[in-house]
Amino acid sequence: MANPNLSWYYSGAYDRDRFRDFDFRVSLHSGLGALLYKFDDRSLRARMGAGTSREFGGQMDEWIPELQFGFDWERKLTKRTRLYTNFDLFPNVEELSDYRLNLRAGFETLLDEALDMRLRAFVFNQYDSQPGAGFNGNDLNYGLALVFGF
């Protein structure tokens, strides 16, 4: 792209959760990202695109066309540490009251620069507006990960 503040993105996800009304979900999305602002210690990027998802083994076992709206925010605290959050909204194109919301927030610190090894602590909240009868629409996960760059 000619504009350095614009970019194409592609995302894919595989979700498996025994507390949901499906065995697993596959989602694929692509679209345009725009860098809204970038300073030395913080940045904000917005994303808008479209794609599809399918919940295998559940009541809605079919491909659902979706839009995607999201943002990625980052704040560098020091040269080695940062805070970040990612937000994504996935409304069903055919029924806008059917949507999913994903929110991830975390803290990351660089442990070894030569290996590009980082320690990441995060929370990940998933909300489904139509989770299925007897299932909770909100799912909060948390984690600690050791991350290596390539």
Each model region followed by its residue ranges:
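Hydrophobic/aromatic-rich structural module bridging two neighboring secondary-structure elements via a short loop
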Residues: M1-G31
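Repeated loop/turn-to-beta-strand initiation elements of outer-membrane beta-barrel proteins
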Residues: A2-W8, D40-L44, L77-L83, L111-L119
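Transmembrane beta-strand segments that form the barrel wall of outer-membrane beta-barrel proteins
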Residues: S7-R16, R45-R54, L83-V93, A121-Y127
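Residues on the lipid-exposed face of transmembrane beta-strands in outer-membrane beta-barrel proteins
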Residues: Y14, S30-A34, M48-A50, F69-R75, ...
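Gram-negative outer-membrane beta-barrel proteins
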Residues: R16-F22, K38-D40, R54-G58, V93-E95, ...
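Residues that define the transmembrane beta-barrel architecture of outer-membrane proteins
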Residues: F24-L28, R42, D61-L67, S97-L101, ...
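Detector for outer-membrane/organellar transmembrane beta-barrel domains
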Residues: H29, D41-F90
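Predominantly the C-terminal beta-signal and adjacent terminal strand-loop region
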Residues: S97-F150
